[in-house]
Amino acid sequence: MKNIIENEKYKLEIFDDLNPCSPREFDNLGTMVCFHRRYMLGDETELKSSDFSSWEELESYLYKEEDALIAIPVFMYDHSGLWINTTGFSCPWDSGQVGYIYISKEKVRREYSCKRISKKLKKMIREMLCSEVDLYNDYLSGNVYGFTLTDKENAEEIDSSCGFYGTDYIENGIFDYVSSYFT
C-alpha cells in the first residue's frame, strides 16, 4: 500500500513498513502468554501449554502463582491473516482464545510507586493492557507504516521514518512528524 499526499511544495509518501519491530519487544506493562500450535505469539515465558488443561486453569495459575492484578483473555482470528483482540471474534471456525495478557500486583506497585492499588489505577491499567493487545494486532495484521517527505522543487528527501503502528495517520504519529510542512 502506498498513499501520497501533496501540496504545492511537498510530497508525503506513506508506505507499508515491511520489517517492523514486534511491539512485544518494547518496554510493555503487561505480559502476554499465548499458546498456538502454529504461531509463536506474545512474550517468551517459562509457561507451556502442556502445563495446563484449560484456559481456566491458566487463568487460575496467573492469579494464584503470578499474583496477577488483572488477566485479560486474548483471542485470535486466523483467516488470510492474523488478528487478535480482547473481546473475541464472531467466526467460530477460524477464531478462539490463544492466551492472556496480565500484570502482577508487584509490578503495578513497582511501576507506579504505590502500596495500595486504587480502582482508578486498576481501570487505567486494564485499558493499557488492552492497548498493548491492539498495538500487537496492528503488528500481526500488517498495519505498520513508514513515510518519506520530499521537496517537490528539487526532489530532495527531507525526512523519512518507519515504525508507525495503526491505520490512522494522526493517531499513529506520522502527521506529527510532517504537520509543519502541510499547514
Predicted regions and their residues:
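Acidic interaction surfaces
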Residues: M1-T183
